[in-house]
Amino acid sequence: MSDDSRPSPSGARTAAVIPAAGRGVRLGPGAPKALRALNGTPMLIHAVRAMAASRAVSLVVVVAPPDGTAEVKSLLDAHALPERTDFVVVPGGESRQESVKLGLDALPPGIDIVLVHDAARPLVPVDTVDAVIEAVRDGAPAVVPALPLADTVKQVEPAAVPGEPEPVVATPERARLRAVQTPQGFDRDTLVRAHETVTDNVTDDASMVEQLGARVVVVPGHEEAFKVTRPLDLVLAEAVLARRRLNDGF
């Protein structure tokens, strides 16, 4: 599905912004999460390649730790990346929200669609990336890939002390819930307006667009687009890569 020969009505150009300034405390001490090795290659490189695998993506902006821009530039230079895609590294901010804004500020004129992708989701398949782009091209101002939930979810009253029992206050209807992934796709003007307008701390960019009152739609996500947050996730990611190598020489 990565054939970009299909013209969009506006000839829209697409860029991806990858905020990679987080420290990844839950993975333990050491390098920032995005720079942790996965099958011998930093997760960030896997994530960059995942975005560049889409022929629709002409530019990838990596938002590095404020004190790690040179290191990330060297990292990109040291790994094989598609020549048809441009790559830029800019310093990030104190929060993910600020880092995404700095990535947006680095985009040149002529970019109409922006993907925002977590560096900690290194294995998202190209078909998922293309599906998000296609939905934005079709007119949705904001698009998120997501999966139905397998587990029942309980809404609770958070305990005052971590580890204490938490009272359940509601059980949302599972059929109406989705677990959201990335890349999230946006009409550029809509996302810029969201970052200029919304000052609340949010967990993803689609939430900012929701606060504008703009439409956000969901497209099917993929099981391999999971977030590598804990040590067990690294084990699963290694297994996915091993299966890919076995199946198609990835």
From Swiss-Prot:
Keyword set includes rRNA-binding: no
InterPro entries: IspD (IPR001228), IspD/TarI (IPR034683), IspD/TarI_cytidylyltransf_bact (IPR050088), ISPD_synthase_CS (IPR018294), Nucleotide-diphossugar_trans (IPR029044)
Site, Transition state stabilizer: residue positions: 26, 33
GO molecular function: 2-C-methyl-D-erythritol 4-phosphate cytidylyltransferase activity
Keyword presence, Nucleotidyltransferase: yes
Record's catalysed reaction(s): 2-C-methyl-D-erythritol 4-phosphate + CTP + H(+) = 4-CDP-2-C-methyl-D-erythritol + diphosphate
Pathways involved: Isoprenoid biosynthesis; isopentenyl diphosphate biosynthesis via DXP pathway; isopentenyl diphosphate from 1-deoxy-D-xylulose 5-phosphate: step 2/6
GO biological process: isopentenyl diphosphate biosynthetic process, methylerythritol 4-phosphate pathway
Pfam families: IspD
Family: Belongs to the IspD/TarI cytidylyltransferase family. IspD subfamily.
Protein name in the entry: 2-C-methyl-D-erythritol 4-phosphate cytidylyltransferase
Organism of provenance: Streptomyces avermitilis (strain ATCC 31267 / DSM 46492 / JCM 5070 / NBRC 14893 / NCIMB 12804 / NRRL 8165 / MA-4680)
